[in-house]
Amino acid sequence: MSYVVWDIETDSAQTDWATIIELGAILLDDNFKEKDRFSVRCRMPQDRVPSATALCINKSNVDLITKGNLSHYEMLVQVEKKFREWSPATFLGYSSINFDDEVLRKEFFKSLKKPYLTNTEGNSRHDALNIVKAAFAID
């Protein structure tokens, strides 16, 4: 089984309103050796206004998020293609189940793509935040 460690940057800190503007992922083998790397950024859709909180968290600015080469939809097509290419895998992130997965699902759904890509068709998901919480609870 392979592992995909991934993270997103968005224009909002709320899952209901967030739009992905950047995604980074690393494919690891069973021994946690890097096999592939993927990073993609898009320009923010013109109908969106980024939250100041998100810009601070992302260490970004309006120029950076409005001048990408890819449209938001083109970026999602590339993400879907890469995640399917890397499947089956366990998708890992930090706070990914409560934020990243939710935002990705909503973005895929709005773009008429399969929203549950990270936990169907042999894929599974896990959240490093839950591992940290469990370790803290045991200690």
Residue ranges and their predicted role:
Residues 2-107:
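Conserved non-catalytic scaffold segment of RNase H-like nuclease domains
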Residues 34-37, 120-124:
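A short coil-to-beta-strand element that immediately follows conserved catalytic motifs
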Residues 86, 90, 111-115, 139:
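Amphipathic alpha-helical interaction segments
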Residues 99-123:
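Substrate-recognition/cap helix-loop segment adjacent to the acidic, metal-dependent catalytic center
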Residues 122-139:
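Short alpha-helix plus adjacent loop in nuclease-associated cores
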